[in-house]
Swiss-Prot record:
One Gene Ontology term from the biological process aspect of the record: translation
One MF term in the entry's GO annotations: structural constituent of ribosome
Alphabetized PANTHER family for the sequence: 50S RIBOSOMAL PROTEIN L21 (PTHR21349), LARGE RIBOSOMAL SUBUNIT PROTEIN BL21M (PTHR21349:SF0)
Purpose: This protein binds to 23S rRNA in the presence of protein L20.
GO CC entries: cytoplasm; ribonucleoprotein complex; ribosome
Similarity field: Belongs to the bacterial ribosomal protein bL21 family.
Keyword terms: Ribonucleoprotein, Ribosomal protein, RNA-binding, rRNA-binding
This protein's name: Large ribosomal subunit protein bL21
């Protein structure tokens, strides 16, 4: 079975025993997390969310993506600005879908 959950403002299609990458979730590696914002499960559609359906996952890793460089330059002056950004993410393994 599969489900569509809402995590970090994004909708993700998940299946059991699948690994997903989400926006940063509070918690350490090895802890279990529960996603209760389930939009779709099998042939059931929520309005907006399904009650009594939960997705259980385990945090595998907290990390950051590769650095992106943001460079701003004003053409008619000597103003330049170079910034770097690394977006944090969480790797989660989906253990089961209850519902």
């Amino acid at each position: 079975m599969y489900a569509i959950i809402e995590v970090g403002g994004k909708q993700l299609l998940v299946k059991e025993q699948e690994v997903i990458f989400t926006e940063k979730i509070e918690g350490n590696a090895g802890e279990k997390v529960e996603f209760d914002k389930v939009l779709l499960f099998g042939d059931k559609v929520g309005r907006p969310y399904l009650e009594k359906v939960k997705v259980i996952g385990e945090i595998q890793k907290q990390s950051k993506h590769k650095k992106i460089i943001v460079y701003r330059h004003n053409a008619k002056s000597t103003h330049k600005r170079k910034l770097g950004h690394r977006q944090p993410y969480t790797r989660v393994k989906i253990l089961e879908i209850k519902g």
